[in-house]
Amino acid sequence: MEKNCYELQYPRDNLYLSCYVNESLNYRYHWHPAEYEFQIVLCGKQEFCRGKENFVMEEDDIVLVEPNAGHASFSTTLNTRTLVIRFSALAFKPFLKKGESFSFSGFPSGQKTRKGPRYTRIRFYAARLLDAASQASPYAPLAARGSAQLLLDP
């Protein structure tokens, strides 16, 4: 599978993003020191490990991984694809007191929650972000930034 990775930078807001569609294959444990990561299962099924948690993710499920949290996944069905969006933790710095960190709650989604309004909204803005990032239009960076900011609204 060809992987197009889109990198977006908004230095005035300390917002640095990357997004791509990934084929979930093998178990590769890793972490990101200064980035959050959303993973949205587009199709298929995968097992996901985040820290000491293990869970199964199905189509439309979303997980968020905080900075420095070890994580890995592997496909349990053929052709499992995920949308991965990583964004800088520094984007929240203006909103936090010294020594605080930003924390999202309610992740991962699951069978009872994946179709709820919060997760539907996240999938919508994530799709808009990927679409805008892939466009050559001079206005695409503006659309991508707006989608990213709405995506990050906890």
Task: Identify what each model region corresponds to.
Residues 1-58, 101-103:
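Generic protein-terminus/edge-of-domain signal
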Residues 37-40, 121-128, 147:
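Amphipathic, well-ordered alpha-helical segments in soluble domains
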Residues 57-70:
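Conserved metal-binding segment of the jelly-roll/cupin
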Residues 133-150:
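All-alpha amphipathic helical-bundle segments outside canonical DNA-binding/catalytic cores
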